[in-house]
A protein has these predicted regions:
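GGW-centered surface loops in extracellular recognition modules
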Residues: 28-61, 66-67
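Short aromatic-cysteine micro-motif
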Residues: 53, 77-161, 182-202, 275
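Cleaved targeting-peptide boundary
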Residues: 20-25
């Protein structure tokens, strides 16, 4: 049985943040973890969601960038964001929005989210749940959707080769681009309501933590090309901060992690493709 747990990002963990109550999901009695959709997904409705997804994939031109606690992060940077290092990436595609509940339901036939709404980002999904979703999505589309690597995520959050060097994804004023502690109204918000970043990507800071493909790992100062993280591990990386975090933890270089079967109402995903 998959579990819904309370998870915290603890300072004692190699890449953890200071423990905070906002990193915890609600009690299991409040969370619907596998709710079947009573209506079968009509073919036209499902296809409309799949077509929308493909039209929302943003081309991210490859390039070289400095990953980690760069100068604009200042004293807010945590040790696990260091050292900075040069990373070169090939081009890829990233969805301009976090996966919505409408898309998840069209593919999976259920909606596990704590907060409900078709255009809200799906949450209360684990890394393992996301792999099942992606497998079914690829079967439906004939594509090879995946989670972004941690390096791809940060490069895109920084604006790729259009970067303006912001502290958050798309702006130095967090409220312009993110739902976070100061403006969350105690819930997630529909995708795409805030301003986008330089690449036209929305909600890369705040709203939900976004899962990456990498196992947890530490940085080195060595230059890397298309890094994928450690080959094995016990915890997966997630990036971007969420609706419950303060500004410090929504910066574009912040790193966090969770177990592959952890779920929470602050955890979701964004899809990547190597080729469209």
């Amino acid at each position: 049985m998959k579990r819904t747990i309370l998870f915290s990002l603890l300072l004692a963990l190699p890449l953890g943040l200071a423990a905070k109550s906002e990193f915890c999901c609600p009690s299991a009695s409040k969370v619907e973890t596998d709710v079947p959709w009573q209506e079968k997904t009509p073919t036209l409705r499902r296809q409309a969601e799949l077509d929308k997804l493909l039209s929302n994939m943003v081309y991210v031109s490859g390039g070289t960038f400095t990953m980690g606690a760069t100068s604009e992060q200042g004293s807010d940077a945590y040790d696990h964001e260091k050292p900075t290092h040069s990373v070169t990436l090939r081009s890829f595609y990233l969805c301009k929005y976090e996966v919505t509940q409408a898309l998840w339901r069209a593919v999976m036939g259920n909606n596990p989210s704590y907060f409900k709404g078709d255009n809200l980002p799906v949450e209360n999904v684990s890394w393992n749940d996301c792999q099942t979703f992606i497998t079914r999505l690829n079967s439906l589309t004939g594509k090879k959707f995946r989670l972004p690597t941690e390096a791809e995520w940060e490069y895109a959050a920084r604006g790729g080769n259009r970067t303006r060097g912001y502290k958050y994804s798309g702006n130095n004023g967090l409220s312009n681009v993110a739902w976070y502690e100061e403006n969350n109204s105690s819930k997630t918000h529909p995708v795409g309501l805030k301003s986008s970043n330089e690449l036209g990507l929305y909600d890369m800071s705040g709203n939900l933590w976004e899962l990456c493909s990498d196992w947890i790992g530490t940085y080195s100062s060595s230059a890397q090309t298309n890094p994928i993280g450690p080959l094995s591990g016990s915890r997966r990386m997630m990036r971007g901060g969420c609706w419950l975090n303060d500004a410090r933890d929504c910066r574009l270089s912040v790193r966090a992690h969770c177990a592959p079967d952890d779920r929470g109402y602050n955890l979701g995903l964004r899809l990547a493709l190597s080729h469209l």
